[in-house]
Amino acid sequence: MTPTSRTPPERAAELRQLLNQAAHSYYVLDTPTMEDAVYDRLYRELLDLEVKDSSLLTPDSPTQRIGGAPAQGFASVPHRIPLLSLDNAFNVDELTGWYVRLVKLLGYQTNPKTPQPDLSMVGELKIDGNALALSYEHGVLIRAATRGDGANGEEITANVRTIASIPLRLQLVHPPAWLEVRGEAFIPNSTFADINTARGERGDVAFANPRNACAGTLRQLDPKVVASRQLDFFAYTLHLPDNWQAKADDPASPMNQWAVLQWLQAIGFKVNPNTALLTDLTAVEHFFKLWDEARHQLPYATDGVVVKLNDLQLQETAGFTQKAPRWAIALKYAAEEAPSKLLRLTCQVGRTGAVTPVAEFEAIPLAGTSVSRATLHNANRVSELDLHSGDTIVVRKAGEIIPEVIGVLRELRPAGAQTLKLPHICPECRSDLVREEGEAATRCVNNSCPAILRGTLRHWVSKGALDVDGLGSKLIEQLVNRGLVQSIADLYALEASLLASMDRMGNKSTENLITALQASKSKPWHKQLYGLGIHHVGEVNAKALAKKFPSAATLANAACKAPEQITSVFGVGNEIAQSLQQWFATPANQELLAKLKQLGISLEANEDELAHDTDQKQRTVSLQGQTFVLTGTLPTLSRSEAQALIEAAGGKVNSSVSKNTSYVVAGAEAGSKLNKAEKLRVTVLNEEELLKLLAS
């Protein structure tokens, strides 16, 4: 049968198959099978058929890779299966600690250096891009989303369709009802260079690194812009329905991670070829060393290797913490360091008035980004470094994320260089800065300081507090600089016409922001309390206080008249009680609370919250006789907060580990205490596990 004798639906189906096969050969296999001129002619034929009869248009058509009209925004969508981040290890000791904990959890007794077939691992490169969740139904791509917060992400399907290495239809004869693939979108180094060259020619600011360029590209509202930047994609994770088995015509269902990578490749995905099956930690160390030395020869950016337990059933047994799988870890490359010439010391002011010194230096490329500023934390750190004008400093990107000054090359110090001192005047409002005795932080105590106001507003609208989408830092800066907002309450009095006149604020953005502000009025009381930004009151303490005191009025009364009621709250000490007393006794804050109430923000728990709290109070917690040791930095709790929680539940916190220690609570950069705990086989908890123990 010739092409002209086929019906339009038959010919369209044939063209889709031919073009998709050709695209897969070109973009994924790197083995072109069709001349460009032939591809273009067939593509045009398919496009003509679809234009004449829109019923022939299908989601897997290659014509759908280049989207149509720009989107108005991105909807938040739930992930079928949480898309979690990985825990990080920055050295071999941390890697070994992870492995020992995993082996112990699975009930194996083995030396980390001894090959154990049941516990083989897969080593993969950690691509420095952006994670995507791809959802397929009956083999057809129906949705693509960003990681987001792990539970929900932004739907960017139209943009992802433009990535040629992502199949719109899977190469399966009998696909399952649903299938989820996770992987990394990225921009190759050569493409990134071309993008920045073009931006420079247009007078646009260059992207700092390929990862930032990729993230910005994926959130473009116009898919045609995304298509022009030629993103690529490596698949690495697969989720299938329980008990689903492939039919004889399709690749056999994978039983381990090594087979998952092969299966993904067989059904049409591009899989990173630089993987290895690893039998023990010695093999992992060799794999890591290999790519640490060779990574700069790759055509894309990588910031470490990922190690995964190979057996999928053992992965399921190991399970997850709240934030990451227990069966995988990212081993990051050592932080990169480079020297640069110090230009000046400046300061930035936070929402509490704390002034953070910042070193500004000649821009240097570091870990894939251009860096010209680094935090110095506080005045004590500035004194320790003994910085002088013209110094050559050494800058490191810790974890390849946060730039920090780690030292000074004093042998290169210019003759007669003057010691640099921190300013004594607030750079924002020109008020005198204050440093209280015993504190490392210098503060601006002017409540009208624009920097404090900006920080206060950013905190109020943050995700942990009122979560007001659409009110970002740039808009807040405009509102403060124009004198339109002088307190949190002023946000709720903003008129639509005024907002629409702001830079980059159209009618739709304004409408969405007004809606988000109205919705924030009904957020839970504990989020409102946290959002007020009272010094020392974090998310954990705000929840505890909100349970005890169901309104701002009852909390204020206790803080000012009965502070012992405050310190009776689980995990709340004198420092927080004093901070609450000072805050509620301040007339400006009393005026703020009154305004918020007038604007419809209840500042009290609703019936659902009260019912939940009543149920929670029925439970009792007792750690009587249990001893704890804290080590490392926990994700959300300070060490004093964790200690207060443990002691309030009857437990005791010691400073050293012994055979009588019940638990060691370990955070990031845990040191010798964690090693000793593992030698003595003391149970090690992370923050999430500690909180579960306290709540059980």
Curated annotation (Swiss-Prot):
Pfam families: BRCT (PF00533), DNA_ligase_aden (PF01653), DNA_ligase_OB (PF03120), DNA_ligase_ZBD (PF03119), HHH_2 (PF12826), HHH_5 (PF14520). It is an enzyme of class 6 (ligase). It comes from the Bacteria. Keywords: DNA damage, DNA repair, DNA replication, Ligase, Magnesium, Manganese, Metal-binding, NAD, Zinc. The keyword Disulfide bond does not apply. CDD domains: BRCT_DNA_ligase_like, LIGANc. Residues 618-696 form the BRCT domain. One of its GO terms (cellular component) is cytosol. Its cofactor is Mg(2+); Mn(2+). PANTHER family: CHROMOSOME TRANSMISSION FIDELITY FACTOR 18 (PTHR23389), DNA LIGASE (PTHR23389:SF9). This is DNA ligase. The lineage of its organism: Bacteria, Bacillati, Cyanobacteriota, Cyanophyceae, Synechococcales.
